[in-house]
Amino acid sequence: MSIISMKQLLESGVHFGHQTRRWNPKMASYIFTERNGIYIIDLQKTVRKIEEAYEFVKKIASEGKDILFIGTKKQAQEAIKEEAKRSNMHYVNNRWLGGMLTNFLTIRNRIGKLEELEKMEEDGTFEVLSKKEVIKLRNEKQKLERNLGGIKAMNAENVGALFVVDPRKEKNAISEAKILGIPVVAIVDTNCDPDEVDYVIPGNDDAIRAVKLITSKVADAVIEGRQGEQLAEE
C-alpha cells in the first residue's frame, strides 16, 4: 500500500509552487509545468520522495534515534507541534535559537530555568511573591515555553534527523545540523535550494493543509519505526 496518494496531495494543494519570478533553478527537475505565473510541482516525484523520506525516518526511529521537527513560519507552527507530540518527538515552532544543536549545554541551562519557574508555579512559591514579581516571572516563563517547550526532554546527542518545513527560513537550523552531520528531511518549495537537504520532499510549504499532510506522514513514519524498535526489543 502506498504511503500517500496523488489525490491526497492534490486536495491539500501540495502541487502549488511559488510565482515563476521567485524560484530556484535547482528545483527545475521537480517542476511539472507553469500555470498563471505559478509553478506546478510534479506530484509523481513528490509521492516518490515522500516514500523515500518515510523509509529513512522509519529507519532512524527504529534505531532509537529522535527526529527534531522544525517549522517556525505561521503556516507550519500548529502542524509541527501537533505531529511531533503525536509521535512523541521534539519540536521547535516559534524561533530557532542559535546553538540549539551545536551548543546544547547553554540551551540546557535555559531549559533548567524554565523547569525551575514551572516548579515555582506548582509548589506555591508564586503565591508568596508580590504581584509585580509574579507578572515578571510568568512573562519570562511564557517566553521560555514558546521557544524551548518542544525540546525540554531532548538530548541533542540522540537527534538522528531533522524534519524541516521551509529550508530557506530554517537555514540556521540546517547549518547546525550540517556541522554535526545530522541528515535533513524537508518540504522544499520551488524557491528553495534542494542541495541543502538530504531528503527533499518537493511541495507547497505555504499552505496549512499541505504542510499538515506531509508532516503527518513523517510522524506516521516515526510511530511505525518506534513500534519496530519495541518489537525488536521484545
From Swiss-Prot:
InterPro entries for the chain: Ribosomal_uS2, Ribosomal_uS2_bac/mit/plastid, Ribosomal_uS2_CS, Ribosomal_uS2_flav_dom_sf
| S-S pairs | none
Name one molecular function that GO assigns to this entry.
structural constituent of ribosome
Tell me the Gene Ontology biological-process terms attached to this UniProt entry.
translation
Source domain of life is: Bacteria
Q: Which GO terms describe its cellular component?
A: cytosolic small ribosomal subunit
Question: Which Pfam family, an example, fits this chain?
Answer: Ribosomal_S2
Which PROSITE patterns does the UniProt entry name for this protein? RIBOSOMAL_S2_1 (PS00962)
Q: Which residues form a coiled coil?
A: none
UniProt keywords, alphabetically: Ribonucleoprotein, Ribosomal protein
Q: Which family does it belong to?
A: Belongs to the universal ribosomal protein uS2 family.
Q: Which PANTHER family match?
A: 30S RIBOSOMAL PROTEIN S2 PROKARYOTIC AND ORGANELLAR, SMALL RIBOSOMAL SUBUNIT PROTEIN US2M
Give the matching NCBIfam families: rpsB_bact
> What is the protein name given in its UniProt record?
Small ribosomal subunit protein uS2
Species of origin reads Clostridium kluyveri (strain ATCC 8527 / DSM 555 / NBRC 12016 / NCIMB 10680 / K1)
Per UniProt, what is the name of the gene that codes for the protein in this document?
rpsB
